[in-house]
Amino acid sequence: MNFETSRCATLQYCPDPYIQRFIETPSHFSWKESYYRSAMSQSTQTSEFLSPEVFQHIWDFLEQPICSVQPIDLNFVDEPSENGATNKIEISMDCIRMQDSDLSDPMWPQYTNLGLLNGMDQQIQNGSSSTSPYNTDHAQNSVTAPSPYAQPSSTFDALSPSPAIPSNTDYPGPHSFDVSFQQSSTAKSATWTYSTELKKLYCQIAKTCPIQIKVMTPPPQGAVIRAMPVYKKAEHVTEVVKRCPNHELSREFNEGQIAPPSHLIRVEGNSHAQYVEDPITGRQSVLVPYEPPQVGTEFTTVLYNFMCNSSCVGGMNRRPILIIVTLETRDGQVLGRRCFEARICACPGRDRKADEDSIRKQQVSDSAKNGDGTKRPFRQNTHGIQMTSIKKRRSPDDELLYLPVRGRETYEMLLKIKESLELMQYLPQHTIETYRQQQQQQHQHLLQKQTSMQSQSSYGNSSPPLNKMNSMNKLPSVSQLINPQQRNALTPTTMPEGMGANIPMMGTHMPMAGDMNGLSPTQALPPPLSMPSTSHCTPPPPYPTDCSIVSFLARLGCSSCLDYFTTQGLTTIYQIEHYSMDDLASLKIPEQFRHAIWKGILDHRQLHDFSSPPHLLRTPSGASTVSVGSSETRGERVIDAVRFTLRQTISFPPRDEWNDFNFDMDSRRNKQQRIKEEGE
C-alpha cells in the first residue's frame, strides 16, 4: 500500500476490512476505466463545490473582504494488483478567513490555523488573497520565523492610537509597568535632567535622553513600547505635536535619518524603531520592541531624542507637552501606561531650578493663606461694646491624614492601634494603671506557657506560632476597660472635631475573638459607638501580595528548606500550589517540615479559591486605551471558516471478471437455493 501525502503532513490510515459499500459500474468497462470514471465524477462534483462562485455570495456580503485560504490535501490510495480492486480516500481541509478591512492594512491577509495545524509553519504574505504553504519554495527551503520588525511587512503598521484624545492616566497594568530616570545632574551644563518633585523632564534638543523601562513580570511575546507627545492643556490637547517648520525643513538633524522630519521624538541606537502616524487623528508616535533586561540589571533602557525646542514658533510655541509611554501587545492592547511632562530647552539645569523654586514659593504662599484666613474679621456691637471674632487656626492635632495600607493583617493591626490611641484620651489614670498591671501579668503567663509548650512540642508542628497569636488575641482590649458610664459619655457631640472625623473606622470595627473571651457570660457586649460609616477606602482583598517561596517558607517557619525548592527552579508559590505529599517527599524535604509545608499549601489553595490574584485586579478609571486587539472593537467583521471534505472511492472489476476473484454472485445464489430446498 502506497500513501501519496503532502509534504508537510502525515496521517496514519488503517483501511476498514468490513466495508459493505458497492458501486455498480457498467459491465462493458474494465476495472481501470471504472475507477477513472468514478474518480472523475467525484472530482467534477468537488470542483463545482470548490469553485469561486460558491463563496462569491459570502464575499459580496462583506463588500470588500480580504480572504486567505490555507488548503490541506491528503490522499490515501491502496494500489491494486494486476486484477484487483482499489480503495482511495481523499481528505481536504480549507481554513478560510474573510475580513472586512482596509486593503492597505498589511496585517491581512495572513494564514490562520485556528488551532488545528499543530506543527505547521505560518507565513505572512502581503498583497495576495490566496496562497498555499505547500509550494516548491516552501518545501525546499528551511522555514524560519520572520522578524516581526522587518520592513515592509511590519506588524507595527497596524497599530495606531485610536482615541482622539489619548489618556494620560498612569496605569501600571498587570505587569507593573514603570518608567524611571537615572540620577541626573542639576548643573547648568547638563544635557538633560529629571525632576521627581515636578515629574518633569528637561533636555536639550537632539541630545540623548535615556529612559528606563521596568516590568515585574515579562509581557507577552512581541510586546512594544510606544512614545507619543501630546499637549498638556485642555485648549491644545486636540492638536498634534509636531516639529516647527524651521527644524523640519532644515538639513540639520535630518540628513541620513530614517525618521520622518516632522516627528518630534526619535529613537537612537535601535534599528527596529517604527515611526507611526495615525491616518485618522494624525498623531505621531515611535515604536520599539520590548527587550528583556540584560543579566544583572532590572531595567530596559531606551534612548530618546527630542528634535524641537518648546519655545519654537510654529511648533510647540511654549505650550507644555506630555510624553505618554505605553507598553502594548502586538495587536495594540495597552498593558501599562506612564506619563511625564517634558520641556526641550537650551539650559535644562537652569530651567529645572527655576521651576522648583517657583513651586516651593507657591506652596509657602498657599500655606500662609490657609493659616491666616482670607475673610474679614466679624464685628458685632452689643450694648455699645465692640466685639471682634477670634480667627480660627488649624491645630496640627486636628489635621486629617490618610495612610494607604497593603494587606489585611497590617490594616487590622493599625486599626487597633488607632482605636487604642483615641480611646486613651478618655480613660482615667487609674484605669490605665490597672490595664498596665493586667498586661504585665498576661505577659508573664504567656512566657511561662510558651516555655512549657516548647519543651513538649515536636518537629513539624506549626502550632506554636499560631498559639502565640491566639494568646495575643485573648489579651483584653482597651474598649473592655471602659465602664458603661464612660462609654455612654463618648458621643459625637462631646468629641472634638478631629476626633469625630476619625471615629467612623472605629464604628465599623467588630469585637475580635479575644475581646469576647475576656467578657463574663452575664456581662453584655459593649455597644458600638454610633458613628456614620464613611470610610474613604475599601480594604484590599485578603490575598498575599508576596508570592515568593522565600516569604512562604518564612511564614511557616521553614526557611531552612529553601534550597530544596530553588535547586528545582521553584521560586513562586504558584508553582507548588498543586503539590501533594508525595511531591514534597520527592524533593527530599525532611519529614519534620513536610507536614507544615503541606498545611501551608492547603491554606493557600483555600485562600486562592475565594480571592482573585492581584495581577487580575484592575482599578477602574477613566483612562482610555487603544484597541484591545479584537476585530470587533475596530468595526471590522471577520469570518473564520473551516471546510472539511472526505471522499472515499471504491472500485471493483466488472461483473464479467468476478469469477476470477471467486466472487460469483450466481453460484452463491444457486448454493443458497440448494440449502433452502434441503431444509424443506
Swiss-Prot record:
Residues 352-388 are annotated as: Interaction with HIPK2. May be sumoylated. Its cofactor is Zn(2+). Widely expressed, notably in thymus, prostate, placenta, and skeletal muscle, although the precise isoform varies according to tissue type. Progenitor cell layers of skin, breast and prostate express high levels of DeltaN-type isoforms. It comes from the Eukaryota. SUPFAM superfamilies: p53 tetramerization domain, p53-like transcription factors, SAM/Pointed domain. This is Tumor protein 63. It comes from Rattus norvegicus (Rat).
